[in-house]
Structures are given as structure tokens and as C-alpha cells.
């Protein structure tokens, strides 16, 4: 890689060097070249107008560099001419000197042209590097954030109001009227929602009452059975007391008058308790709804109680 770079550098330096005419050959060729040297020099020289146009924009190269370059090139050419040529070939030296100057001028013109091109390319690149501000090209919808749905909704809410309906109205009046219309619509919507919700509440209340009644029915039945059992126990207890009283009444010789009075009082209290129990039983019958079996039991109890009361009253009399 290094060798390739060195070769390219040498090739570039060789191409930059001015072309020199070969000084070998016979005296006839030299004389022929000396005769036509002026024609060749004029042919190599460009027009003065073109030279001015090419040298005018050259600002990068200073005068000192050009003087140094000329001082380096002229002595080398003079040394080479003294070494290879004789004193008789002074005219040829003049021609070579003119050719060397022309070649130097042509090289300078080429360098100036390249410098102009580099300046133009540099300015173009700097202009291209300057960034232009990016302008938004898409319309942003009105509303909160960039939500398109909210923008469309806000646009749909803006109803066009014609001037024929409100010729003397201002923007504030129109907005107040729109708000009042929206509030009226909301007020109309609320009673409808309440009406729709009321039947559901009634249905729910009906369902709950029906369920509670269904749940209470077995409790009523159990309560009626418990009361019938209590009545049976009380009736049996009272019957035993009455039988004891009857037995004591059948033995008047053994029982004193005080005991008789106590027995009479106990019978009266038993009657009052029986009447009270019968009254309570009737009241419970009116309140409760009993099964047919419980009704039959109650009838049997009533009949038995009434029979016992009649028997006790007949015995007392």
C-alpha cells in the first residue's frame, strides 16, 4: 500500500513538471528548431484577454510564492543550458527560456482555475449545509392535544346559526341560547330516566315482598302447631284439677267448709282461666291461617273444653 502511494506521488510530480524539448540531434535539426522557435512560442502563448480572465480571480496565491517559484525554476534552466549547450546556441537558450516561462504561466493559470473551482465547490457545500427551518404542513386539529376524535367532536358541536332567525343577535347571545337549549334537553332527559328506573324498583319491591311472604308461611304453620300443643297441655292440666275438685266435692264429710270455699274459688279461677284461654284462642284463629289438620285439632279442643266446662258447671250447681 505504501509503495502504491509513493508511486502515485511520483507520477503526480512528473506530470506537474514542464515538458522540455529534447536537445539531442544534429546541427541541422537544431537550426530548424531555432528558426521556428518564435512560431512555437506564439502558438503556445494564449491570448492576453484570456490570460487576464484567468488570472483576475486568483487571490489565494501570493506574490512572494510566485517570485520564489520563478527563482527556483530559472537557475535550474540556466544551469542545464550551460552544461548541455555551447556558446554558439544562445538563440536556442532564449527560445528555451521563453518556452519555460510559457509553461510556468500555463501551470499558474491551471492552478488558478482549480482554485476557483475549489472556492465555488466550498461555497456550494456551505450553502447546502445551512439547514432551513421545517415548517409544519399538516393541519393540527383543534382540541385537547392532537386527538382527532375530539377535534371532530368539537367541530360537530358548532352548529351554524343563520342570521335570518336572529338578525340582531350577537355572538354572546347565540352562545347563551345554545347553552340554554342544551340545559333544557338535559332536564328533559332526566325525568325519562327516572321513569324508566321506577318500574324496576317496584318490581324489585314486589319480588322481595313475595319472597318474604313465601318465607313467612312455614313460620306461621310452625307457630300454629306450637300453640295447639300448648292449648292441649293446658286443657289436660285443667281437667286434672277439675277431677281433683270433683273428687273432693264427692267427699263432703271429710272436707271442711273452708276447703269447700277454696275448691269453689279454684273452680271459679279455673273457669276464668278457661274463658280467657278460649278468648285468646279465638283471637289467634282470626289472625293466623292454619292448615286443615290444625283446624280439626282446634275444633276438637274447643269441643272438649266446652264439654268440660259444662260438666264442671253442672257439678257445682
Curated annotation (Swiss-Prot):
Acidic residues composition-biased segments: 86-110
Cellular component terms per the entry's GO annotation: apical part of cell; cell projection; cytoplasm; extracellular space; Golgi apparatus; perinuclear region of cytoplasm; vesicle
Keywords for the protein's UniProt record, in alphabetical order: Biomineralization, Cell adhesion, Cytokine, Glycoprotein, Phosphoprotein, Proteoglycan, Secreted, Sialic acid, Signal
PTM annotation, UniProt: Extensively phosphorylated by FAM20C in the extracellular medium at multiple sites within the S-x-E/pS motif. The phosphorylated form inhibits hydroxyapatite crystallization. Dephosphorylation via a mechanism involving ALPL/TNAP promotes hydroxyapatite crystallization. O-glycosylated.
InterPro entries noted in UniProt: Osteopontin (IPR002038), Osteopontin_CS (IPR019841)
Pfam families: Osteopontin (PF00865)
Location within or outside the cell: Secreted
Signal peptide: 1-16
Domain of life assignment: Eukaryota
Location of the motif Cell attachment site: 144-146
First-listed, main subcellular location of the protein, grouped into a coarse class: secreted
Feature: compositional bias, Basic and acidic residues: 174-187, 223-240, 248-263, 273-297
Function: Major non-collagenous bone protein that binds tightly to hydroxyapatite. Appears to form an integral part of the mineralized matrix. Probably important to cell-matrix interaction.
Complexes and interactors: Interacts (via N-terminus) with integrin ITGA9:ITGB1.
Protein name per the record: Osteopontin
Gene: Spp1
Amino acid at each position: 500500500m505504501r509503495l502504491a502511494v509513493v508511486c502515485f506521488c511520483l507520477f503526480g510530480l512528473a506530470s506537474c513538471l514542464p515538458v522540455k524539448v529534447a536537445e539531442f540531434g544534429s546541427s541541422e535539426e537544431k537550426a530548424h528548431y531555432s528558426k521556428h522557435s518564435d512560431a512555437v512560442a506564439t502558438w503556445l502563448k494564449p491570448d492576453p484577454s484570456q490570460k487576464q480572465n484567468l488570472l483576475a480571480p486568483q487571490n489565494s496565491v501570493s506574490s512572494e510564492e510566485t517570485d520564489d517559484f520563478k527563482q527556483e525554476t530559472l537557475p535550474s534552466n540556466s544551469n542545464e543550458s550551460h552544461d548541455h549547450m555551447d556558446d554558439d546556441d544562445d538563440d536556442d537558450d532564449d527560445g528555451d527560456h521563453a518556452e519555460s516561462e510559457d509553461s510556468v504561466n500555463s501551470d499558474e493559470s491551471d492552478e488558478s482555475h482549480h482554485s476557483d473551482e475549489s472556492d465555488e465547490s466550498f461555497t456550494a457545500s456551505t450553502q447546502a449545509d445551512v439547514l432551513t427551518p421545517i415548517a409544519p404542513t399538516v393541519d393540527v386539529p383543534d382540541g385537547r392535544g392532537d386527538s382527532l376524535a375530539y377535534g371532530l367532536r368539537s367541530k360537530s358541536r358548532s352548529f351554524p346559526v343563520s342570521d335570518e332567525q336572529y338578525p340582531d343577535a350577537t355572538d354572546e347571545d347565540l352562545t347563551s341560547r345554545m347553552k340554554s337549549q342544551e340545559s333544557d334537553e338535559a332536564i328533559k332527559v332526566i325525568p325519562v330516566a327516572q321513569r324508566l328506573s321506577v318500574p324496576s324498583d317496584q318490581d324489585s319491591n314486589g319480588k322481595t315482598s313475595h319472597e318474604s311472604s313465601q318465607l313467612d308461611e312455614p313460620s306461621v304453620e310452625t307457630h300454629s302447631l306450637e300453640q295447639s300443643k300448648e292449648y292441649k297441655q293446658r286443657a289436660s292440666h285443667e281437667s286434672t284439677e277439675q277431677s281433683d275438685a270433683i273428687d273432693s266435692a264427692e267427699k263432703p264429710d271429710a272436707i271442711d267448709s273452708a276447703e269447700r270455699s277454696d275448691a269453689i274459688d279454684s273452680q271459679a279461677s279455673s273457669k276464668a282461666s278457661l274463658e280467657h284461654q278460649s278468648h285468646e284462642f279465638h283471637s289467634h284463629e282470626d289472625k293466623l291461617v292454619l292448615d286443615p289438620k290444625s283446624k280439626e285439632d282446634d275444633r276438637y279442643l274447643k269441643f272438649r273444653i266446652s264439654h268440660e266446662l259444662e260438666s264442671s258447671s253442672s257439678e257445682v250447681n
